[in-house]
C-alpha cells in the first residue's frame, strides 16, 4: 500500500485483521488466509489493489509471524504426559488454504515425533472440519474405531460437530474466539483436559 501512497498505522491494520480472523474462525469453511488481505482491502475501500501480491503476502506471513508463534504453554507437557500414559496421539487440522503449508508448519513442531497420524482437512480430505471425514480418517490412520477416540479441540464451530458426529468423546478447551456448542467436557486448558482423560 505504501507504493500506492496509502498509509495506515500498523496498530489499526492489525486490529482489523484480528477482527477478520475471529470472524473467519467462526465459519465452517476452508480458512484461506488470502481472504484476510482481500477482506481488509475491501473494508479500507481499496479493493482495486488486489493482485498476485496478496498470495505473496500470505506466504510471507507464514514465514515470519506465524512461524514465530509460540505453542500454548502446556502443549509439550500435555503431549508427553499422554504419551507416557499410553495414549496414541494424532492431529486433525484444517488446511490454511495454501496446499502443503499447514503440513510444512506441523513438521517444524517439537511434538511431531509424538504423533502417530496427521490429517490436514481440506487436503487429505475434500472437506474441512466440521465435516465428519477428517475425523473418521484420523481414526483409520491410528487403527482405532472413532468411539474409542477422544478429540480435544478449541473451536466449537468446527471441532464439536465433527468429532461427536462420528462417535468420539469431545473435550473443548476454552480459548479466545467463538463460543457455544455442546462438548462432552469443557476444559480451561490442555492440562485440565489431560486430567479429564486420566479420570475417564
For the regions a language model picked out, list residue spans one by one.
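N-terminal helical cap/lid subdomain that shapes the substrate entry/recognition surface
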Residues: 1-80, 84-85
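Asp-based, Mg2+/Mn2+-dependent phosphohydrolase catalytic module
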Residues: 8, 49, 76, 80-83, ...
Amino acid at each position: 500500500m505504501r507504493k500506492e501512497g496509502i498509509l495506515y498505522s500498523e496498530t489499526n491494520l492489525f486490529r482489523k485483521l484480528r477482527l477478520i480472523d475471529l470472524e473467519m474462525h467462526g465459519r465452517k469453511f476452508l480458512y484461506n488466509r488470502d481472504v484476510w488481505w482481500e477482506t481488509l482491502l475491501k473494508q479500507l475501500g481499496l479493493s482495486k489493489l488486489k493482485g498476485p501480491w496478496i498470495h505473496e503476502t500470505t506466504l510471507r506471513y507464514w514465514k515470519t509471524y506465524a512461524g514465530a508463534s509460540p505453542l500454548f504453554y502446556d502443549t509439550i507437557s500435555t503431549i508427553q504426559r499422554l504419551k507416557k500414559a499410553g495414549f496414541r496421539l494424532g492431529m486433525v487440522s484444517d488446511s490454511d488454504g495454501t496446499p502443503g503449508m499447514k503440513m510444512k508448519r506441523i513438521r517444524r513442531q517439537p511434538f511431531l515425533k509424538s504423533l502417530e497420524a496427521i490429517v490436514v482437512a481440506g487436503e487429505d480430505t475434500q472437506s474441512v472440519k466440521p465435516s465428519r471425514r477428517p475425523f473418521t480418517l484420523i481414526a483409520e490412520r491410528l487403527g482405532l474405531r472413532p468411539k474409542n477416540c477422544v478429540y480435544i479441540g478449541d473451536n466449537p464451530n468446527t471441532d464439536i460437530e465433527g468429532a461427536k458426529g462420528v462417535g468420539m468423546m469431545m473435550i473443548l478447551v476454552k480459548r479466545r474466539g467463538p463460543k457455544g456448542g455442546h462438548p462432552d467436557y469443557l476444559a480451561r486448558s490442555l492440562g485440565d483436559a489431560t486430567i479429564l482423560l486420566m479420570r475417564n
